[in-house]
Amino acid sequence: MGKGDPKKPRGKMSSYAFFVQTCREEHKKKHPDASVNFSEFSKKCSERWKTMSSKEKGKFEDMAKADKLRYEKEMKNYVPPKGETKKKFKDPNAPKRPPSAFFLFCSEFRPKIKGEHPGLSIGDVAKKLGEMWNNTAADDKQPYEKKAAKLKEKYEKDIAAYRAKGKVDAGKKVVAKAEKSKKKKEEEEDEDEDEEDEEDEEEEEEEEEDDDDDE
């Protein structure tokens, strides 16, 4: 199911993801009470997958094809909630949010997992990373947490400066708008004065003509 919308169809799985799922289920049946060493288990699955013949992999490839059809069919009937397609405007110059300790950990280990499990789907890679993080000792997490804290501190300073600059720019726009409005008003007043002067001149000329006629 989708993270934001519970009605969103579940993402399609790869043939390798189905294979790993089967291995996990087999392991649980054989060792229901045993805790799984995720790293070792993943390595064994990867090695086993590499040695399998095309015929053995065929079963999982068929499962992946069927799941792909299921996903495509569900997506055709899926209507996203209103407003989901609309994206908020993001200023490209705004400071980017800092990554979390877990995100930094993922950035480091994601290429390794992809290398060990080339057929793994994005969702399963994320799941593996989550399990690895949960099994990581607090001391081993510290370097990532320290780096994340430093990046957060820098971000807070940058965003404060960015917002302050935004207020200054907004203030400049207001002043510029006011000056423009004032200038326009002055120009209109000057035009009115010119029209009044022209009217006065016309009246004077008419009076002079009347005087000439009287003579």
Curated annotation (Swiss-Prot):
Its main location: nucleus. GO terms for biological process: DNA geometric change; inflammatory response; innate immune response; regulation of transcription by RNA polymerase II. InterPro entries: HMG_box_dom, HMG_box_dom_sf, HMG_boxA_CS, HMGB. Residues 75-95, 166-215 are annotated as: Disordered. GO terms for cellular component: chromosome; cytoplasm; extracellular region; nucleus. Disulfide bonds join 23-45. A motif (Nuclear localization signal (NLS) 2) lies at residues 178-184. Residues 83-94, 166-179 have a biased composition (Basic and acidic residues). The modification Cysteine sulfonic acid (-SO3H) is found at residues 23, 45, 106. Residues 27-43 are annotated as: NLS 1. Reduction/oxidation of cysteine residues Cys-23, Cys-45 and Cys-106 and a possible intramolecular disulfide bond involving Cys-23 and Cys-45 give rise to different redox forms with specific functional activities: 1- fully reduced HMGB1 (HMGB1C23hC45hC106h), 2- disulfide HMGB1 (HMGB1C23-C45C106h) and 3- sulfonyl HMGB1 (HMGB1C23soC45soC106so). Residues 9-79, 95-163 bind DNA. The acidic C-terminal domain forms a flexible structure which can reversibly interact intramolecularily with the HMG boxes and modulate binding to DNA and other proteins; may involve Lys-3 and histone H3 'Lys-37' and 'Lys-38'. Multifunctional redox sensitive protein with various roles in different cellular compartments. Nuclear functions are attributed to fully reduced HGMB1. Associates with chromatin and binds DNA with a preference to non-canonical DNA structures such as single-stranded DNA, DNA-containing cruciforms or bent structures, supercoiled DNA and ZDNA. Can bent DNA and enhance DNA flexibility by looping thus providing a mechanism to promote activities on various gene promoters. Can restructure the canonical nucleosome. Proposed to be an universal biosensor for nucleic acids. This is High mobility group protein B1.
